[in-house]
């Protein structure tokens, strides 16, 4: 695993962290509080497989930083963004998620990670969504994706395969402000 030279990092144990950007506020049905700002970004600190490992094994079996993860030198992940337009707004709702890559595609991603113009060198790569988003009625794990590399400092864009999964439909058609609030309340209840 050391050949990828990733900085090991301990992640928090909650499966979803709330990295937020905001719009006008709302009253939360979960906690009853008035929140001045509407969250438009959520993310997981690690791929789902990482959470299945015993905490005492994570440092030994995983190499991870904020953007890349290798587990047991056989599972390779990159962090990216599923972007969903917010209808009647210029805002984007963003899920920061982890996607698995083949070893070959991970090596190419790693090789170009800090190279200017990397987005021109790397074609879209197949991956499996490796983040569980609990506010969907069907599992989001293992949805088919394409990983689109963007300029250095910008997380890859994650394009879901066009299916009838609710997340895929939302990525194609957008979501309302009411749906953003529904997601915020669902994640509030799950925290």
Regions found by a protein language model. Give the residues of each.
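C-terminal, charged low-complexity interaction regions
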Residues: 114-191
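Weak global preference for isoleucine
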Residues: 12, 71, 82-87, 94, ...
């Amino acid at each position: 695993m050391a050949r990828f030279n990733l900085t090991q990092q301990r992640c928090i144990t909650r499966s979803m962290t709330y990295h937020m950007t905001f719009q006008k506020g709302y009253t939360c049905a979960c906690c009853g509080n008035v929140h001045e700002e509407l969250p438009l970004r959520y993310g997981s600190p690690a791929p789902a497989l990482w959470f299945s490992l015993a905490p005492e094994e994570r440092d030994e079996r995983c190499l991870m930083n904020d953007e890349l993860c290798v587990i047991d030198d056989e599972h390779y992940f990159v962090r990216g963004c599923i972007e969903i337009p917010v209808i009647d707004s210029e805002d984007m709702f963003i899920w920061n998620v982890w996607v698995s890559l083949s070893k070959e595609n991970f090596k190419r991603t790693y090789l170009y990670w800090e190279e200017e113009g990397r987005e021109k060198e790397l074609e879209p790569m197949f991956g499996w969504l490796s983040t569980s988003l609990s506010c969907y009625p069907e599992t989001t794990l293992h949805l088919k994706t394409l990983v689109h590399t963007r300029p250095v400092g910008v997380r890859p864009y994650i394009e879901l395969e066009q299916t009838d999964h609710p997340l895929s439909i939302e990525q194609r058609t957008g979501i309302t402000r009411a749906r953003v609030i529904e997601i915020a309340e669902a994640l509030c209840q799950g925290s």
